[in-house]
């Protein structure tokens, strides 16, 4: 099967989602900050909201692939199972004494059961209920409800850990410790799952590499015309962008990258929290963003990159030039600064385009939705009171794997 994402707005054909599950029940007021959520979720309501999101997509002929299903099916393949467990259950993470019983337990699980443990985590008590353990300093120092294998609630935001860039995929190095293990699951899926293993596609970046070179998919927007827009943000570093750029340029698919220097704040952790593409040459942008400095990266000979720094006032011109259009159509909702800040916090600009001029957004951002509608954008709304507590909207919660090319 072919996988390709040539733009942010081409007709969406296939997408990876993750329906929130028992990993959300591991969130507590005490650990939510470490796990990068602003509050604990009401799981049943979050699942209802996510199901509505999926129904909107399937109602527009989008094939929805669920991460948990892909992972469970992948883990039935012995090589994939060993790859994941060797990296997740080992002496470095669990200590020598606890590793053997935990590995024995996980080795004996079905693919679906193992996927559940990898995503939802496992506590000391849950391990001891299932298997006897020798004396272990690691276990002795833990309470019964302490997590020997932490959960991965941020798998909800499938955009970040992997993103398809033109004809290949970037499996991303994550900035925060709470998300680093997500990458291992995606690497196994793309390498061994039958849906992907039979296809040939470039892997632009491998996510388990160590060091400060991080890239997260929420900062990556494939705007078309061989160009990519990337945020230099709280989660994506200049080192990561340069590493990704060198591989994209070597692949010959991308001809330039526009890096946007963002404010490093929680509210604006990724580029897609403040701007997304909604139609040809058209972006919805948070009113409080202003114009930011940009840097244009282009290939320059063998393994070389040229970098041009652009003034903040040239931001729109630089993006338009990369797109090959005369100018951008920038849609900024006219509202006071307090209303704008509230809607940005609630992911008002975090829209998922499923076709040119057709987007999915949270229903709560009434001002932005009405403004976009008045400017010819078809806005499909979904509830997000619970799923939005991790600071992510429809764009964050989706990893497109196939879009139609723009005419």
PLM-predicted stretches and their roles:
Residues 1-407:
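The feature marks the mature, well-folded catalytic cores of soluble enzymes
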């Amino acid at each position: 099967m072919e996988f390709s994402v040539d733009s942010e707005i081409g007709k969406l054909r296939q997408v990876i989602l993750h329906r929130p599950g028992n990993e959300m029940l591991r969130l507590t007021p005490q650990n939510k900050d470490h796990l990068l959520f602003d509050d604990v979720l009401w799981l049943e309501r979050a699942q209802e909201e996510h199901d509505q999101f999926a129904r909107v997509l399937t109602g527009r002929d989008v094939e929805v692939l669920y991460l948990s299903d892909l992972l469970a099916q992948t883990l039935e393949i012995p090589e994939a199972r060993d790859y994941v467990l060797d990296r997740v259950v080992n002496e470095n993470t669990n200590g020598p004494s606890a590793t053997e019983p935990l590995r024995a337990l996980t080795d004996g699980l079905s693919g679906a059961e193992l996927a559940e443990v990898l995503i939802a985590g496992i506590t000391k008590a849950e391990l001891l209920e299932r298997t006897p353990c020798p004396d272990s300093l690691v276990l002795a120092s833990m309470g019964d409800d302490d997590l020997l294998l932490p959960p991965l609630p941020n798998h909800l935001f499938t955009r970040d850990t992997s993103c398809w860039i033109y004809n290949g995929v970037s499996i991303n190095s994550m900035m925060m410790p709470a998300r680093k293990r997500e990458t291992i699951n995606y690497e196994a899926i793309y390498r061994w799952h039958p849906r992907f293993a039979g296809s040939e596609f470039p892997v632009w970046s491998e996510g388990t590499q160590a060091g400060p070179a991080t890239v997260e998919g929420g900062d990556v927007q494939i705007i078309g015309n061989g160009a990519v827009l990337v945020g230099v943000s709280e989660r994506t570093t200049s080192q990561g962008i340069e590493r990704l750029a060198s591989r994209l340029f070597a692949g010959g698919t991308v001809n330039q990258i526009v890096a946007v220097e963002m404010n490093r704040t929680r509210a604006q952790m990724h580029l897609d929290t403040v701007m997304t593409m909604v139609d040809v040459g058209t972006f919805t942008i948070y009113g409080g963003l202003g114009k930011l400095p940009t840097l244009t990266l282009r290939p320059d000979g063998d393994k070389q990159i040229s970098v041009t720094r652009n003034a903040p006032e040239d931001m729109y011109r630089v993006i338009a030039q990369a797109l090959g259009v005369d100018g951008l159509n920038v849609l900024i909702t006219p509202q006071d600064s307090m209303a704008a800040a509230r809607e940005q916090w609630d992911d008002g600009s975090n829209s998922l385009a499923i076709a040119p001029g057709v987007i999915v957004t949270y229903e709560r951002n009434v001002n932005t939705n009405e403004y976009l509608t008045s400017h010819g954008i078809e806005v499909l709304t979904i509830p997000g009171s619970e799923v939005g507590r991790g600071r992510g909207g429809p764009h964050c919660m989706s990893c497109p794997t196939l879009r139609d090319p723009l005419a």
